[in-house]
Every structure is written in C-alpha cells, then in structure tokens.
C-alpha cells in the first residue's frame, strides 16, 4: 500500500482485484464523471477504453489498450507526470482515487519508474483526501490490464442469488447440460483412475474477496516466470490461475457486486498437456493428479 514491495516482480504483475491492472496505478473515476470530463469515451460499442468496453460497463469483461492522460494538482502540488484515467463501476461521482506506492525513483531494478506518485500531492493536512484539480492532456498511454483477455461475450458464467431466491427454488444452478457430440463419446472413455483416491478442492465463493493471494502463491510454488508489462499487453501473462471480477445490475453508476470467480488450473483427469509433452515433464500420478517433473521440462509450451 505504500510501495515497500514495489521491487517485487510477482506483485507488480499480479492483477489488481477490481480492475485487473498490472505494472501501473491509475486514476479511478466513475462512468458519469468520465462522461463529464470527456475521458475514456469509446468511439463505438466495440472499442476498448480504460475500464469499459465502449459504452457497456455491465456484465462484460472490459479492459483497455489505451487510456486518456490527465494532470492532477492539489494545493500547489502536481503529480510529476500525467496520470491515466480508468473507469471504475461503483466509484462515487466527482471522486478520483489513485493508489499510493508507485512512481518510486530508487526502488530497484524492477520497481523504479513504474506508475505515478500520489505522494506528490499528499499534504500533512490532507493525508488521504482533499479537493483537487484535474486537466485533460489530450494524450493517451497503454495500460496492461488482463480483463480484456478473458471477455466472456455475454455468457452467464457467474451466477448470483440471494437467500430468498434460493429457498424458493433450491435446485437453482444445479442444471447440467449434456456433453457435446464427439467422435469419441465420453461414455466410452477409459476411466483408468476412477478406482483410486479422488483429490478435489472447494472454494467458498461467499468468502472469496478476490485478493489474488492464491495467484502469487501458485506462481511461487510452480516457478512461473514474470513476463513484464509489454508481454501482458500481448496477452502472454503465464499465471496458472486467475480471479475474475464481475459487476451486475442495470445501472452503470450503481452496479451490483463486485463478484469474484476463481478460474483455476484444473489438474485434469484427462489432461491434454500430458499427451503432447515430448519429454514427459507433465505426467499422471497413480491418484489421478496432473504432476509436473520440472527437471525434464524444456519449455516447449505445447
């Protein structure tokens, strides 16, 4: 929160829980305030701009390639370089939020120069908030947000009910679709591991707050590399799991949520990576787990 871990590449590449931004901080504003200032307004409904997919904010996995830059001033102080704007559903109108801990000049090889320093406008009589001034620069910059990489195209992958709805229809959400037709019918698959111990993990979605700590833990446990801002912009981040954040409701300025949906590496029972690995670095254990033998891996990424 104050930049003490700014030189940690794992944490810089960890997506923000709400806006999925990596390697940067931004100035968060509401959709209504963005329209008032004329920032991050898409030319059409399919253009990705900071925090939205064109004019549609709800039930989409928006993101951006470019965000408008603004200057932020307060009591004679000014953030040393123009700050990118980001539209945040649920953000209060006429309020701008910028996270501290970025824009450090001597953080180290990883953290130096990343982001924008909110400390430039922090004052002893206004440590956390105050009435400032904002000016649009007429320029844009690229922000590495992973939201755009997993657009769900309106598919109902996250389902939310309150207690009354669940009591009225307890079977809600238990419907199962049939398997797609295949040349290799599922019923004929050889169930080699069905007689052994079954491993599984459950996640209480009522408790998950989208902190992403499990994403970093997985990265540390599995030696997953950091790829950097440029490669994240190319959808090449290598995390084995992610925590999607969704908003619902019909009012873009007062949405429901956020709701968090973990999307995990599945430890597949019939893992396709095991079949294609040329050096048998990924193999199946006797208990049905998808195991990795690191000293065999040659990095083909098949």
Language-model regions: role of each:
Residues 200-222, 259-280, 289-302:
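Cysteine-centered iron-sulfur cluster-binding motifs in ferredoxin-type domains/subunits
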Residues 81-83, 93-98, 143, 252-263, ...:
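Short, well-ordered strand-loop elements centered on a beta-strand within folded domains, enriched
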Residues 176-195, 235-276:
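Active-site-adjacent "gating/activation" loops or surface patches in catalytic cores
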Residues 18-21, 28-40, 196, 274-289, ...:
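Long hydrophobic segments that form regular secondary structure
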Residues 1-239:
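A cross-kingdom feature strongest in bacterial/archaeal respiratory oxidoreductases
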Residues 221-256, 283-296:
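Non-heme iron-sulfur electron-transfer modules
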